[in-house]
């Protein structure tokens, strides 16, 4: 069945996307395969009718767009995010040792349930900045194997564990890397051919090594880590690549740092989208008034996950607006308007 093929394609996509940098690399590969040209923010853009392009920022956010063959009068945008709730390695010397074990100093990144991170195979991925002659370059890295774990105390030493535990990241959740010698060859796990002194900085994130699965009596459900928001990033890319721009510029944006407020230079609250649309406007020979007119007629979908109804906790849900798995697209209208536009834009 076709939906099972698509579901497996999503799971495969998620397994390749182990950090925001890997998400943008994967998106770039898909765009390249479909005839898109990569642009640079620092260079002049030369766009043609029917052209397909994309631009990245910080290697962790990407905006792709299609120029229609004829004149356009609006932008049709779908946006998602590349980051996921996880743990981030802290600092350039993250090793915590006690003479027997080496642990990694980490901090929580984004909103998550902490308990599922215990007692399972975890690994690390992200990027490192290395010396390259008289310059520097960024290199994507992935340990690619079961590397660390966060062990629970045995129940004999923690009889209250099934009564509810408040976990401290700094006390309970520093992952064990290895014995006391582990820090001596840590960097070799990622860049075995690069001298330690040539590795200048790093951004590493934990990821769950357990693969996602399709389950249920009729294979109707799917489970995986990083569904928030790689599910939407995957669906947005698939829909965007299948669409054809006619009378409007189609735009697919995947932003970083949604999980921590979107306030970075590559976040959704940055200038990245606005400046990209301004670049498009100028490269297509349109003036500022035309840009504002086109913007006023544009439409944007912010694509993220929704929480489905939990049958064991009906009291937690609105009595009328309940979401069920496989029930279709969810629209979130709320009075404080953070999630949707006025009703007229939803019709």
Locations of regions flagged by a protein language model:
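N-terminal capping segment at the start of a domain
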Residues: 1-21
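Acidic/His- and Gly-rich active-site-bordering loop/insert found
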Residues: 38, 42-89
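Soluble metallo-hydrolase cores and metallopeptidase-like ectodomains found primarily
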Residues: 58-64, 69-72, 131, 141-224, ...
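A generic, well-ordered mixed alpha/beta core segment in the N-terminal half of proteins
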Residues: 74-160
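Alpha-helical metal-binding/catalytic segments enriched in His/Glu/Asp
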Residues: 223-261
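Short glycine/threonine-rich loop-to-helix capping motif typified by GTGT followed
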Residues: 261-273, 305-317
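A glycine-rich helix N-cap at a beta->alpha junction
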Residues: 273-296, 300
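Conserved small/polar residues in nucleotide/adenosyl-binding loops
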Residues: 337-343
């Amino acid at each position: 069945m076709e939906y099972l093929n698509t579901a497996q394609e999503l799971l495969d996509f998620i397994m390749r996307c182990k950090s925001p940098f890997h998400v943008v690399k994967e998106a770039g590969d898909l765009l390249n395969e479909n005839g898109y040209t990569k642009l640079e923010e620092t260079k002049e853009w030369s766009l043609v009718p029917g052209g397909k392009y994309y631009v990245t920022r910080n290697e962790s956010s990407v905006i792709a767009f299609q120029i229609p063959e004829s004149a356009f009068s609006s932008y049709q945008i779908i946006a998602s995010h590349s980051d996921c709730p996880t743990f981030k390695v802290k600092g350039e010397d993250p090793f915590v040792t006690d003479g027997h074990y080496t642990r990694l100093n980490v901090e929580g990144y984004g909103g998550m349930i902490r308990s599922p991170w215990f007692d399972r195979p975890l690994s690390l991925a992200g990027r490192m900045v290395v010396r390259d002659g008289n310059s520097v370059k960024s290199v994507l890295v992935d340990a690619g194997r079961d590397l660390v774990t966060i062990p629970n105390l045995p129940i004999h030493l923690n009889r209250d564990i099934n009564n509810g535990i408040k976990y401290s990241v700094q006390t309970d959740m520093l992952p064990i890397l290895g014995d006391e010698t582990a820090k001596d060859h840590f960097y070799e796990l990622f860049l075995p051919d690069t001298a330690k002194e040539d590795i200048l900085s790093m951004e590493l994130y934990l990821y769950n090594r357990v693969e996602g699965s399709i389950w249920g009596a009729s294979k109707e459900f799917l489970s995986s880590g990083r569904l928030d928001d790689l599910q939407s990033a995957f669906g947005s890319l698939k829909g965007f690549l299948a669409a054809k721009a006619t009378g409007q510029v189609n735009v697919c944006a995947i932003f970083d740092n949604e999980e921590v407020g979107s306030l970075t230079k590559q976040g959704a609250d940055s200038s990245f989208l606005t400046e990209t649309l301004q670049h498009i406007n100028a490269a297509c020979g349109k003036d500022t008034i035309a840009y504002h007119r086109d913007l006023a007629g544009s439409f944007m979908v912010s694509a993220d996950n929704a929480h489905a109804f939990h049958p064991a906790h009906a009291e937690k849900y609105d009595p009328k607006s309940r979401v069920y798995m496989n029930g279709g697209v969810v629209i979130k209208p709320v009075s404080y308007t953070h999630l949707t536009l006025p009703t007229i834009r939803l019709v």
